[in-house]
Structures are given as C-alpha cells and as structure tokens.
C-alpha cells in the first residue's frame, strides 16, 4: 500500500476498497473489546468534532469507556505539562498515576548507552519501568507526554493498558512536530 501517495483517496470520498480484504473480513479484525473502543472513539469524534482539544477529547473518550484510573508516562522535560494534564484528569474525576522517564535514576552506563555529557551520572530514560509501574498500579488507559522517539515505542509495547499520546516531543519545534511538515523551510 502507498496511501500517502494516492492523489484521490476514494476510500474516503467514494467508498472504494483498494485492498484484498472484504468489508466482512475487515470487521472480523476487531474483537469485541476493539469494537467497544471504536464506539467510544467514534462517539468522541462525532460529538466533539472541532469543539474540543486533544486533552478534552481524551477525557471524554476515557469516560465513554468507563475508565476510572488513568496513567501518564512523561518526559522530565515536560514535567510542568504532565502536571497540568494530571490535574485536568483529576478535575474530571479520574484517579491519576504518573511516572517520570528518569524513574529509578539508572545511569546510562548500566546499559552501555551513549551520554550527552560523558563522565557524569546521566539517568537513562526508563520507559519499560514506567510501563511496569503503571501496570502494577492497574491503570486502564495510559497517556504519553513527551517521551523520546523509541522510548514511546518501548513504553507502548510494555504497557498492558491501551496507550495514546497527549503531547509529542519535538525539542526544535516547541513540541509541534507537524510544524516541520507545514513549513516550506523543512521541505
């Protein structure tokens, strides 16, 4: 598939199916839990389209699913943003668990990781432990706030709860990676 290079996107505009899968086969890809999540996602989109921020939509979505406990895995560089998000979710009635990327303060030397400043203690980002702690806390839905590229993947793979991203880190573009796509200077 090369949908990114399709000039027409008739799947969206005309109901065209460009794959080998029948509609029945596609529906079979979704378990009942998947369908429940799809219903909550569809309700979030249809009732709040162009009305809510991603943070607000995330709380709405969690309520639609009946979630009570939310986890936040965040980068130390976005600690203030994580605090704001955690407080927002608490104000919406959720129990919130949050874990910083530097949890346990394991030096990068322990895993033979490259350091920004060699010769000094530099705590590694610890996405698998972030996931383990949130798994142990029994979170039902986890959100990423600014985890590094690769660490976000490690966290997602290790999390027992479904994961979504609230804020994507981009150190150069003020955490707005889409800015590179919108700017002619990056093309």
Regions found by a protein language model. Name each.
Residues 53, 122-136, 147-149:
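Active-site glycine-rich loop that binds ribose-phosphate moieties when present
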Residues 70, 96, 163:
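Hydrophobic anchor at the start of a short beta-strand
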Residues 81-88, 152-161:
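Short Gly/Thr/Asp-enriched flexible loops that form oxyanion-binding sites at enzyme active sites
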């Amino acid at each position: 598939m090369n949908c990114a290079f399709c000039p027409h996107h008739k799947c969206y505009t005309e109901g065209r199916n460009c794959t080998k899968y029948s509609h029945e086969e596609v529906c079979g890809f979704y378990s009942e839990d998947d369908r429940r999540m799809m219903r909550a996602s569809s309700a979030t989109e249809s009732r709040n389209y162009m009305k809510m921020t991603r943070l607000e939509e995330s709380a709405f979505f969690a309520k639609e699913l009946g979630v009570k406990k939310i986890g936040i895995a965040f980068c130390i560089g976005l600690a203030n943003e994580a605090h704001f998000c955690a407080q927002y979710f608490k104000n919406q009635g959720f129990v919130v668990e949050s874990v910083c990327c530097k949890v346990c303060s394991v030096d990068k030397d322990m895993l033979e990781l490259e350091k920004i400043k060699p010769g000094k203690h530099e705590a590694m980002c610890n996405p698998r432990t972030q996931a383990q702690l949130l798994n142990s806390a029994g979170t039902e839905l986890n959100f990423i706030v600014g985890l590094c590229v690769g660490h976000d993947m490690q966290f997602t793979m290790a999390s027992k709860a479904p994961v979504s991203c609230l804020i994507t880190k981009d150190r150069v573009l003020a955490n707005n990676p889409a800015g590179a796509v919108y700017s002619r200077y990056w093309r």
